Amino acid sequence: MTYLLGIDGGGTRTTTCLSTGTGKILARAVVGPTNPLKVGFEATERELLRAAREVLRRARLAGVVPGLSPAGSGGAPKVTFESVCVGLAGVDRPQVHGRLFHWLRRAIPARHHWLTSDADIALRAAIGHSPGVIVISGTGSIAYGRDDRGRVLRAGGWGVPFDDCGSGYDLGRKAIIAALRDYDGRGPYTQLTQKVCRALKIPDITQVVLKRLTPKDVAALFPLVLDAARRRDAVALALCDEAGRNLAELAVTLLRRMGWLRRVIPVVYAGGVFRASLRIRRSVTRHLRRYAPQARILLLRHPPVEGALTLARELAES
């Protein structure tokens, strides 16, 4: 039997899926983050191996992935992958792609390997091979587009501390800034001050500078902004609108570069921030429609890992 492996890796978690060659899903698994620019190459490689092992274990199959032997799988039949497709944040840099692709071919044996960005597999899951744009806002943010000729463009996604506007990290960082400004009297009162202190278990907001917060820790604060906005906190409402404007700018930038501002074209919203906040989705749409009134707005309905499986199946059939 032919087996396909699809992996979707980001700054928060990694989802993997095993299917037959006909597309029947056999197992899914979730492990830790695999963005090499945020967690490093070694941690990324470790979690990718763990993802492959775990999905095989759940499918009660033994594979050729190191660390998973037939004996460790209850005597299950030993299988190899026909094709493996991995979509990761951060791999569109040539030096990153080259190193990880070389590792992937050695570590997870298969007849075919494909390494691409998480944005690519998400767009594939949303609209297949059709032209369009996807805006992703999770731990980080990026816009990715594909035109009629298959040409690929991107905007944003340059990472912490230089970019990722409108992301969970950006919202969490600005929540901390707003709380510090509130404490000083440089900015208005905001519920975020108390919420951030409670979330970080600190007696007052000045203690935040002593915390060794990772980008993931900061991104985990973004739901506080959404909660404060629901309670009509003026600062939180402004932060949500600013996030919407920043994310719309990513999409508009690609639509302009592709000459699509007046064309009916799908613009897909994806990632944890979009899933969590109707307010931010509406803000993005409002700002986007000022420049691209005919854009066809879609919320990603299929998990990006399904886009990875689609690519894996195409590789197997090529």
Segments (PLM) and residue ranges:
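Intrinsic, low-complexity polybasic segments
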Residues: 63-67, 71-74
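Compositionally biased, intrinsically disordered low-complexity segments
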Residues: 58, 67-68, 94
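Long C-terminal interaction/binding lobes of large macromolecular proteins
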Residues: 86
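ATP-binding/phosphotransfer module of carbohydrate and carboxylate kinases, centering on a glycine-rich
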Residues: 1-61, 75-82, 103-108, 125-133, ...
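Phosphate-binding/catalytic loop of phosphoryl-transfer enzymes
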Residues: 91-189
